[in-house]
Amino acid sequence: DNTIKHTLINCEKTKEVVINVVNYDMVQQVSLSSTEYPDGVNEFLKAGFTAIASENVKPYRVAESPVQMECKVNQIIALGTEGGAGNLIVCEIVKLHINEDILDENGTISPEKIDLVSRLGGNWYSRAKEGLFEVEKPLATLGIGVDAIPNFIKESAIFTGNDLGKLGNIETIPTEEEIAIFVQNNTQVKAVLSSTDEVKIQQKAKEYLNNEDALSAWKVLLAQRVE
């Protein structure tokens, strides 16, 4: 209906906000707080949250939130004039509060302990820790890149873009000696290679990729070409 939400009005007035991240334990209360209560109604009380004073800004923090960010509003960018167009609020974090219960043994935030949720469309939300998986980051290494992968691998219908990304993330292609030793010590790979069936060979390599073993996948794929 093109009305302005109280959050935006408060941002424009105070030029300060607190961003409280939402985890699964508080999602129902957060949903309740999104009710269009009249201006002036204390939504902390309505949602059953605990308001605690901030240190560097005027707005209160939500005690139940595992991470609270005190922010100064730098810019408000209108994304349109029609109903539902929205606004982009650019903020500077001036104080960060982290509940130590969400930290792992290394002092970093554990994605399982923080148990974040995200808002989707309609009534739908997503619980982050139920969809966790790891992707190795090439921060300390220099991957050879997909462009260095032979065409017979890149053009195969068996390998996905993710598979090619894994193959391209190794630092060096295995040597002939490394491949020979690998094949010699692996009877299953020997059997697949003896069939000379390219599809079966590539499927075997894909098994290694599915198990996050790109180096062995390379050895399977190149074995026949170094004999």
What residue spans do the PLM features occupy?
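Basic, polyanion-binding surface patches
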Residues: 1-227
